[in-house]
């Protein structure tokens, strides 16, 4: 034992003189494990970088092909040889800039990939091929030396145990072998560990350098791309300026087209209801330089306003509900109302997943943009119920204030969530909700009523559309009922509230407190079972806003033609006084007589007629505006016995035959309405006659000549007789009146049927012309 201790001490001294001692041997485990890990990581990283490099090479080639295609595409928009192909020069130039930029950037990417391959991949490949092998050789030498040391040490231990039975020489020989193995193992271990350490250090330094160079390569790549983008910025600004001019030209063209295309389908469109024509206003007693417009012209003005391009702001999405309704003069935004009516159709309300299935997002976006721009005001040509339901949800979602408002959120939710306060009674809860809904603004309430009515009807078809009240509430509630600060709990409460409102639609909206709120014209239909939404296809009174009928035209006076048969006039009455003769004539076929003393007025006189025995529907003491179109005059014409002057646009009409001769001064103030023309056998203008033109000299009735016609007051009950268009022109040179040639068949009486007997004596119609007007009468060609 004493010798062993001495030998062990000598070995320690020998090992202590070396640079690397046995105390570093525990590092062997750490370093060998590090080398194994580095070998695995290096192999994986090498494969990834190689794959990345190949992928980038393919990307570079594809991007270069893309740049070439863009350059070719730019040539389609401009051709310097043929000016007719210059579709859009700014677009062609921009495509050219983009194509060249992509090509340059891909060249930079090519350089970037080469730098990575040369530095990082080369370093990793070198480590895998040489350094890893050197490390493995050092490890093998270390293991071999350790085995020799372990064998010598074990042999020495065995001899020591048997030292009493063996010679001392064998023990000394074993001790020398152990000393040699220990020295050899110490040298190999020091050398192997040093080699491993050098390999690890080299890998770390080279990897750091490769990673740093990669970052610099990325920096150079992006810097070159940025520099190139900045270099083309000036050219891009020039093309932007040219494109702005191009857009301005497009806007001008669009305005010209829109004035023709907009509201092209006037007869079939249900967008705007035409108002009825305004009643004729009574003329003032004072002279007016501009006459009142005729009813026909007012109709034309209304039609022009209807087909005109909508001006001002037509935006619907993102606008306040009150702003839209005030702008459109409606209770509910028109396009939303039409959408609800569309969804109420049987084929749409039974669509599976209505209000849940999403449509084509591009179609929805295009529809919203066109509605905001005012290009679409109807749903003609749209048959996708999912598109329209999503359109309605998008409108509700983009409202700046939700449909049920922020202020009423907690009030509505509390009615349903705190149902214990109402003993869980649906009727009491519904009444509480009714009290809250009364506080809604008018547009919000009416739209909510129509919307909930639609949802209730959809829920009744849940067996077909798979949309129960719960499903509908989940899809609609987040768009119509939410607080200012959203959270999960508020959404859950809103879903429960909307589900209750849909389920109890009849109890809520048929409540007496709000059933007639705001006098909603599109009330809930459906009778005792509740009803659908406003004006739906299920029943109820049609909303006048959806009327497609144009305003009724003013009634045209009925023309009366005397046929070639004698009038049924009592013979005895013709021999009586002039008043009784006039009365019997009026009761048979002639109009009521004109008063002998009409009110006198220098301009726009008012004539009052009283005819208690007339068969027409003329009210007594009817005031008539003589400035309106002669077709709408309420006074019957009569033959004038003398020349009279008038300030109206029409020629004078004669008095009834039974009337006595009227002084010229009084008749100058009479304003006639209808011209009686085609007179035969003209006589002196100053000659008067008291002979009844409808009777012979013996007092018996006689037929009427072919050249006489007159208007009776229109009773607005009969249909006007078809008329031919006579060739007759009346020109008025008065510059202060709105006269025009009577070329329309509505302005002339129909021709008379031919008769055999001529009229005996009728005076021609003449008129005293003032200095400001001249009226010329051309004969009517009755051929």
From Swiss-Prot:
Bias kind Gly residues: ranges: 527-539
Location of this chain's protein in the cell: Cytoplasm
Record PANTHER family: RHO GTPASE-ACTIVATING PROTEIN 68F, RHO GTPASE-ACTIVATING PROTEIN GACR
Taxonomic lineage of the native organism: Eukaryota, Amoebozoa, Evosea, Eumycetozoa, Dictyostelia
GO molecular function: GTPase activator activity
CDD domains cross-referenced by the UniProt entry: BAR, RhoGAP
Assigned GO CC terms: cytoplasm
Annotated protein name in UniProt: Rho GTPase-activating protein gacR
Positions marked as site (Arginine finger): 356
Compositional bias segments (type: Polar residues): 706-738
Entry coiled-coil feature ranges: 138-188
GO BP terms: small GTPase-mediated signal transduction
Chain ranges of the Rho-GAP domain: 319-509
Pfam families linked: BAR_3, RhoGAP
Alphabetical UniProt keywords: Coiled coil, Cytoplasm, GTPase activation
Organism, as annotated: Dictyostelium discoideum (Social amoeba)
Location of the region described as Disordered in the Swiss-Prot/TrEMBL record: 262-299, 527-745
């Amino acid at each position: 034992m004493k010798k062993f201790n001495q030998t062990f001490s000598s070995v320690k001294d020998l090992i202590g003189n070396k640079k690397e001692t046995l105390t570093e041997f525990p590092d062997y485990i750490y370093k060998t494990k590090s080398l194994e890990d580095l070998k695995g990581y290096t192999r994986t990283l090498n494969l990834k970088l190689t794959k990345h490099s190949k992928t980038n090479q393919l990307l570079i080639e594809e991007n270069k092909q893309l740049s070439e295609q863009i350059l070719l595409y730019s040539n389609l928009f401009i051709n310097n040889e043929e000016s007719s192909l210059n579709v859009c020069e700014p677009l062609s130039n921009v495509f050219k800039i983009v194509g060249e930029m992509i090509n340059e950037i891909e060249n930079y990417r090519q350089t970037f990939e080469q730098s990575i391959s040369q530095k990082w991949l080369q370093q990793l490949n070198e480590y895998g091929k040489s350094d890893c092998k050197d490390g493995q050789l050092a490890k093998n030498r270390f293991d071999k030396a350790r085995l020799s040391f372990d064998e010598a040490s074990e042999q020495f231990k065995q001899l020591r145990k048997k030292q009493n039975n063996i010679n001392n020489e064998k023990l000394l020989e074993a001790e020398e072998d152990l000393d040699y193995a220990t020295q050899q193992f110490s040298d190999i271990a020091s050398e192997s560990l040093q080699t491993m350490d050098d390999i690890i250090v080299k890998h770390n330094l080279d990897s750091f350098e490769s990673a740093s160079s990669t970052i610099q390569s990325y920096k150079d790549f992006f810097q070159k791309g940025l520099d190139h983008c900045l270099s083309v910025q000036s050219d891009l600004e020039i093309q932007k300026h040219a494109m702005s001019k191009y857009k301005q030209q497009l806007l001008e063209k669009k305005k010209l087209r829109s004035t023709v295309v907009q509201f092209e389908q006037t007869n079939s469109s249900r967008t705007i209801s035409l108002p009825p024509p305004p009643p004729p206003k009574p003329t003032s007693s004072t002279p007016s330089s501009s006459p009142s417009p005729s009813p026909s012209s007012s109709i034309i003005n209304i039609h022009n306003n209807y087909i005109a391009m909508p001006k001002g702001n037509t935006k619907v999405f993102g606008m306040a509900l009150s702003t839209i309704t005030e702008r459109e003069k409606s209770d509910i935004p028109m396009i939303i109302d039409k959408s609800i009516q569309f969804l109420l159709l049987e084929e749409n309300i039974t669509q599976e997943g209505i209000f849940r299935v999403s449509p084509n997002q591009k179609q929805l976006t295009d529809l919203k943009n066109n509605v905001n721009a005012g290009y679409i005001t109807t749903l003609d040509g749209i048959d996708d119920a999912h598109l329209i339901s999503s359109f309605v949800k998008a409108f509700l979602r983009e409202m700046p204030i939700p449909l049920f408002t922020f202020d009423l959120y907690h009030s509505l939710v509390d009615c349903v969530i705190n149902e214990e306060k109402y003993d869980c009674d649906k009727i009491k809860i519904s009444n509480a909700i009714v009290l809250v809904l009364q506080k809604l603004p008018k547009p919000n309430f009416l739209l909510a009523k129509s919307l909930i009515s639609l949802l209730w009807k959809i829920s009744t078809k849940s067996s077909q559309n798979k949309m129960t009240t719960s499903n509908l509430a989940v899809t609609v509630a987040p768009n119509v009922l939410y607080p200012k600060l959203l959270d999960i709990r508020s959404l859950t409460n809103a879903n429960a509230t909307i589900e209750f409102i849909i389920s109890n639609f009849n109890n809520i909206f048929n409540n007496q407190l709000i059933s007639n709120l705001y006098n909603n014209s599109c009330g809930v239909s459906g009778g005792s079972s509740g009803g659908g939404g406003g004006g739906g296809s299920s029943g109820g009174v049609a909303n006048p806003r959806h009327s497609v009928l144009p305003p009724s035209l003013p009634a045209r006076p009925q023309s009366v033609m005397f046929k070639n048969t004698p009038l049924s006039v009592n013979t005895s009455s013709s021999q009586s006084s002039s008043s009784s003769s006039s009365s019997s004539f009026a009761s048979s076929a002639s109009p009521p007589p004109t008063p002998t003393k009409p009110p006198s007025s220098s301009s726009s006189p008012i004539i009052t007629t009283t005819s208690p025995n007339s068969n027409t529907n003329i009210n007594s003491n009817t005031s008539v505006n003589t400035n309106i179109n002669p077709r709408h005059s309420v006074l019957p014409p009569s033959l004038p016995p003398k020349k009279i002057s008038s300030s109206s646009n029409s020629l004078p009409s004669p008095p009834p035959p039974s009337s006595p001769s009227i002084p010229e001064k009084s008749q100058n103030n009479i304003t006639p309405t209808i011209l009686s023309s085609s007179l035969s056998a003209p006589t002196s203008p100053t000659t008067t006659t008291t002979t009844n033109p409808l009777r012979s000299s013996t007092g018996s009735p006689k037929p009427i000549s072919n050249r006489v016609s007159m208007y009776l007051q229109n009773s607005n009950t009969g249909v006007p007789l078809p008329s031919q268009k006579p060739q007759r022109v009346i020109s008025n040179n008065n510059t202060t009146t709105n006269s025009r040639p009577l070329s329309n068949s509505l302005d002339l009486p129909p021709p008379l049927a031919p008769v055999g007997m001529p009229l005996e004596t009728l005076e021609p119609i003449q008129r005293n012309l003032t200095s400001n007007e001249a009226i010329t009468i051309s004969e009517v060609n009755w051929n």
